[in-house]
C-alpha cells in the first residue's frame, strides 16, 4: 500500500528542487524529515510540507503505521514557465524565466521479513 502527496505550480526551479529531493529518496520518514530540516535550501521547506502531507495521507486515509513508512518514490516534474522581460540597453529586452515545479512524494510501508 502506498500514499502520495503532490504540490503543483510551486515557484522553485525543478533543477534546484531535484537537488533536495535526491537526498531523501529511499530514506525512512524520520531520517528524511531530519535531512530536510537541516538542508539550507529554499526547496527543502516546500518538500518538507509535501512529505508531511504524504505521511498524513498514509495515516488517515490508508491506516498505515507511521513508524513503518519510507519514501518509496520522490520526483520533481517541470511546471509551466512564467516569462518576464527586463529592459536592457539600447532598447532591447532580456527574457527572465520564472520556473515552476510539480513535486510528488510517495510513501510506502516496509515489507516485513
UniProtKB/Swiss-Prot annotation:
The answer to whether UniProt assigns keyword Ribosomal protein to this entry is: yes
> Which key words are in the record?
Ribonucleoprotein, Ribosomal protein, RNA-binding, rRNA-binding
The molecular function terms of the Gene Ontology recorded here are: rRNA binding; structural constituent of ribosome
- InterPro entries in the record: Ribosomal_uL22, Ribosomal_uL22_bac/chlpt-type, Ribosomal_uL22_bac/org-type, Ribosomal_uL22_CS, Ribosomal_uL22_sf
Q: Name one Pfam family in it.
A: Ribosomal_L22
Q: Name one GO biological process term.
A: translation
Q: Which residues cross the membrane?
A: none
UniProt keyword Ribosomal protein, yes or no? yes
Q: Give GO cellular component annotations, separated by semicolons.
A: cytosolic large ribosomal subunit
Function as written in the Swiss-Prot or TrEMBL entry:
This protein binds specifically to 23S rRNA; its binding is stimulated by other ribosomal proteins, e.g. L4, L17, and L20. It is important during the early stages of 50S assembly. It makes multiple contacts with different domains of the 23S rRNA in the assembled 50S subunit and ribosome. The globular domain of the protein is located near the polypeptide exit tunnel on the outside of the subunit, while an extended beta-hairpin is found that lines the wall of the exit tunnel in the center of the 70S ribosome.
Report quaternary structure and partners. Part of the 50S ribosomal subunit.
Q: Which family does it belong to?
A: Belongs to the universal ribosomal protein uL22 family.
The record ties this protein, via HAMAP family, to:
Ribosomal_uL22_B
Q: What is this protein called?
A: Large ribosomal subunit protein uL22
Amino acid at each position: 500500500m502506498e500514499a502520495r502527496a503532490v504540490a503543483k505550480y510551486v515557484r522553485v526551479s525543478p533543477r534546484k528542487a531535484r537537488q533536495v529531493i535526491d537526498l531523501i529518496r529511499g530514506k525512512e520518514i524520520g531520517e528524511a524529515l531530519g535531512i530536510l530540516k537541516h538542508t539550507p535550501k529554499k526547496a527543502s521547506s516546500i518538500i518538507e510540507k509535501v512529505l508531511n502531507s504524504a505521511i498524513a495521507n498514509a495515516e488517515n486515509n490508508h491506516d498505515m503505521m507511521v513508524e513503518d513508512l519510507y519514501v518509496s518514490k520522490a520526483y520533481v516534474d517541470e511546471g509551466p514557465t512564467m516569462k518576464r522581460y527586463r529592459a536592457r540597453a539600447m532598447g532591447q529586452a532580456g527574457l527572465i524565466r520564472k520556473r515552476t515545479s510539480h513535486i510528488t512524494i510517495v510513501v510506502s510501508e516496509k515489507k516485513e521479513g
